């Protein structure tokens, strides 16, 4: 089995022995991408941020900005990965940054560019305004730090980005093209263990739950992983290597949520940001609490089930779930 993802207009195929290697290390040391930077090596500063896009059979696209310093390669399987250096000079994000003089020493700039790019793609995908006000800009930048404290010009760039977006340009075309190339590559390999992410859950050639349990039985010391925000710290800060990884995000049932008049059912591997976005529709008063919960790139990776399993004292969903009379099943 291999890991396959798309970056810089080409497919990267890696052996699963590199599952626990960080995306940052691979991009800089193997792919020659120098725009991603290592600052804190623990997902706090955002200098290493990249934009990741995956096909989503329920919503079309899953777009998120993640910290490459703590992102294991396994979790990038069948994804598109964009770095700041991948954007053309005429892109609205680049134009807005230039016209706003939003870069000072430049070390953090690629991460801010990627946060803007993720917001830009999400807005184009949903057909809405990109970053309508200062509060929205601060939320987009919640996972980025500027040591020069040049936030005023960065916020200006965020608020003016839409003015540089030409209506006759299809900015999502590279996304569709990349996903098509990736899907064709996976199908051409004809590996039954390579599940095309473009197919609906009912189209999967194997039952991912059964397959994951089989792998666990064969590799009893392997660790289950979803968002990998805790695991990433083991790798980057403690230099520990697990005895194999099993990605729970390849199980569709664990990454979706459903709600009806009987309540809400949330998959354990669903990202916290997706869960919070859904909650805010019904309980907007939760916004202040939820936005204090890590930065957006962490929330976009970390899962609800992982948060409960890790029992972290600095990022705890349990009080909220208690208040909502939640149950585990």
Where are these regions (language model features)?
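A gly/ser-rich beta-alpha-beta helix-loop segment of oxidoreductase catalytic cores
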Residues: 51, 231-232, 289-325
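Structural signature of FAD isoalloxazine-binding scaffolds in flavoprotein oxidoreductases
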Residues: 66-70, 226, 233-258, 267, ...
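Structural motif
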Residues: 79-80, 104-106, 221-223, 243-246, ...
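Conserved SAM-binding loop
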Residues: 147, 224-225
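Alpha-helix capping/helix-boundary segments
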Residues: 154, 230-231
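A short acidic-Thr-Gly-centered motif at the start of a beta-strand
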Residues: 209-219
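Signature of N-terminal electron-transfer/Fe-S-associated modules in redox systems
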Residues: 1-210, 250-254, 258-265, 270-271, ...
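Ligand-binding beta-strand-loop-alpha-helix segment within the catalytic cores
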Residues: 270-300
């Amino acid at each position: 089995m291999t890991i396959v993802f798309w970056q810089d207009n080409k497919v990267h195929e890696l052996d699963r022995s590199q599952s626990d290697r960080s995306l940052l290390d691979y991009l800089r040391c193997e792919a020659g991408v120098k725009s991603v930077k290592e600052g804190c090596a623990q997902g706090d500063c955002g200098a290493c941020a990249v934009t990741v896009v995956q096909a989503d059979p329920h919503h079309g696209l899953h777009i998120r900005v993640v910290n490459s310093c703590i992102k294991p390669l396994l979790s990038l399987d069948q994804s598109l990965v964009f770095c700041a250096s991948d954007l053309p000079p005429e892109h609205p994000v680049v134009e807005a940054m230039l016209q706003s003089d939003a870069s000072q020493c430049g070390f953090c700039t690629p991460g801010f560019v990627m946060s803007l790019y993720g917001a830009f793609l999400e807005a184009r995908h949903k057909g809405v305004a990109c970053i309508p006000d200062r509060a929205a800009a601060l939320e987009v930048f919640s996972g980025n730090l500027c040591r020069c404290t040049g936030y005023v010009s960065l916020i200006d760039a965020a608020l003016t980005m839409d003015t540089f977006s030409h209506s006759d340009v299809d900015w999502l075309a590279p996304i569709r093209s990349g996903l098509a190339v990736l899907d064709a590559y996976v199908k051409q390999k004809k590996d039954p263990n390579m599940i095309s992410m473009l197919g609906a859950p009912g189209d999967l050639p194997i039952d991912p739950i059964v397959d994951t349990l089989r792998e666990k039985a064969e590799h009893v010391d392997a660790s289950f992983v979803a968002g990998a925000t805790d695991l990433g710290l083991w790798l980057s800060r403690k230099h520990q290597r697990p005895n194999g990884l099993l990605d729970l995000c390849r199980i569709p049932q664990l990454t979706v949520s459903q709600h009806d008049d009987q309540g809400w059912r949330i998959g354990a591997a669903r990202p916290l940001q997706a869960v919070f976005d859904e909650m805010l529709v019904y309980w907007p008063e939760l916004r202040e609490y939820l936005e204090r919960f890590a930065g957006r790139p962490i929330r976009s990776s970390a899962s609800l089930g992982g948060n409960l399993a890790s029992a972290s004292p600095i990022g705890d969903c349990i009080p909220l779930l208690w208040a909502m009379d939640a149950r585990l099943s």
